[in-house]
Amino acid sequence: MITTLYKEPASFAHEFSNINLLWASLFIEELVRNGISDFCIAPGSRSTPLTLAADQHTEAHTHVHFDERGLGFLALGLSLFSHKPVVIITTSGTAVANLYPAVIEAKLSAIPLIILSADRPVELIDCGANQAIDQYRIFSHYPVFFAQIPSATTHIKPNYLLTTINQGLQQQRQTPAAIHFNIAFSEPLYPQTATLNYQGYLQSLKQWLIDKQPFSQYFQNKDSFQAASNTQLRDKKVLVIAGRVTGINQAQAIAEFAALNNYPLLADLQSALTGNANNLHYYDLLLVNKQFTENLQQADIIVQFGGKLISKRLSQFIEGFAGEYLLVDPGNTRIDPAHSLRKRFVCSATQWIKSLQNKIPDIDKHWSQVLQQQNNYITKQIISPFLDNNLISEISVISALDKLLPADNPVFIGNSMPVRLSDMFFRQNAALPFSNRGASGIDGLLATASGIAKSCASITTLLIGDTSFLHDLNSLALLKQLQGPFVIIVFNNDGGAIFNLLPVPTQQKQDYYQLPHGLTFADSCRQFSIDYYQPESLDQFVGDYQKSLQNRLSLIEICVKNDQTYNHLEYIKEQIKYATF
């Protein structure tokens, strides 16, 4: 027997018997906000929070059937006729497996189904617990999106659920088929008499609770770009962030957009815009200063182009930002580690900027000017005086390279300390920056830089840490294939100096994190016929680098104490933190 139930509309509550019921209600609410109205439900205990949430939602039409296999095909029929996604809710165990035939048909017929399968919590899997099977990706490649949702907890922001739902729906819009959310529910599953007030927990959804729109909205065509963009940006203080951007024309479009509208720009190293006049070059360091941060928080909206930001402080700023936050990026992957993104434009920077058509009216140039003045102040009063000596250090070498790197030639910057310092201290760099910031690993960096050098046949510079270099030492064999010049700059701080910046236990720091090796790389260079330099002053480094630009293969080893960079950064941050502008 199949039963269909209809109800009348109400607003989202703050009080629930337990967090399972809250999370389930968030799930159903966000699906309804995305225009989904049909919910097919099979009976089961573990799926109780989802069943009750669907039943209690006034805009959810529920269809009930005792057999999951038939329920799956019922959902297919509903979707076939309505041309809308249909939700299927099941309990755990073989109940989920019975949906497999419908999931296959959905894939082959391009029919959008949304599976919400309840699961046992992780501690009850593979231990003999009742009705507990491995449901992780149970439908193999047939769904176009899968998410394993952990057991509900107040330690995970509710935003995570909403952004995950919307990412799945976005994938489904592009490739209609099933999407699968496997949701672990710990007990209690049922309502109790007493309720808890979750208003504080839901604070990060304040605007979502008011506006009745999906938390994350995706825009993909020109009309929607123009309507959304012009409405949002008009008469607003806009902060532009440039993340990883592909192509010089994209970077130039972002720079012109910021300059034309007097918007402050925070340019990540990967954007190739660090030398732009509008860029607040030292924003990462300035974010330790309360006055600067408060000024930056006056922004009404953040427009971010590209993702994978290097600066942790900037990512934290975005996470705590109270205004509107939108992202422009042509890729399909989610770029939202803070789970705070409300609007995502799936297009290139040039497409999005062109869709604005006209110059947005100027507003409050003073705000942008104050931010630039604060950036200029620390440049003149703190950074420049600190660098005004001949001391060789990781920071001084990067600051020197900022002026020395050949324009329009590639520089590959290794992960860990080199990329962070480069992001902090490059100011006018006109080289083409590259890095492996997808997974941010420290392996294969020399080999990647070699590939770039083979492709471009121009001067290539590699900036790499000693531990990363040790990881990829055998890739020196690749260099014999290069025409050159190829310049390797190794920061040798005798192990993982990056861990000085992290709160690792002091007692175990050397033996389990930094692993000092006591090695230098002169002999490695002899073995592979590479010119070797080890400068002892900044002036020597400048001379050695300029000579290396005339050689085929060169390695410049910068040997510094393990704690030098940590001490220098702490000094600089302390000066900036207490600066008054």
From Swiss-Prot:
Its EC number is 2.2.1.9. Pathway: Quinol/quinone metabolism; 1,4-dihydroxy-2-naphthoate biosynthesis; 1,4-dihydroxy-2-naphthoate from chorismate: step 2/7; Quinol/quinone metabolism; menaquinone biosynthesis. Its cofactor is Mg(2+); Mn(2+); thiamine diphosphate. Binds 1 thiamine pyrophosphate per subunit. It comes from the Bacteria. It catalyses: isochorismate + 2-oxoglutarate + H(+) = 5-enolpyruvoyl-6-hydroxy-2-succinyl-cyclohex-3-ene-1-carboxylate + CO2. GO terms for molecular function: 2-succinyl-5-enolpyruvyl-6-hydroxy-3-cyclohexene-1-carboxylic-acid synthase activity; magnesium ion binding; manganese ion binding; thiamine pyrophosphate binding. SUPFAM superfamilies: DHS-like NAD/FAD-binding domain, Thiamin diphosphate-binding fold (THDP-binding). Keywords: Magnesium, Manganese, Menaquinone biosynthesis, Metal-binding, Thiamine pyrophosphate, Transferase. One of its GO terms (biological process) is menaquinone biosynthetic process. HAMAP family: MenD. Catalyzes the thiamine diphosphate-dependent decarboxylation of 2-oxoglutarate and the subsequent addition of the resulting succinic semialdehyde-thiamine pyrophosphate anion to isochorismate to yield 2-succinyl-5-enolpyruvyl-6-hydroxy-3-cyclohexene-1-carboxylate (SEPHCHC). Belongs to the TPP enzyme family. MenD subfamily. Homodimer. This is 2-succinyl-5-enolpyruvyl-6-hydroxy-3-cyclohexene-1-carboxylate synthase. It comes from Psychromonas ingrahamii (strain DSM 17664 / CCUG 51855 / 37).
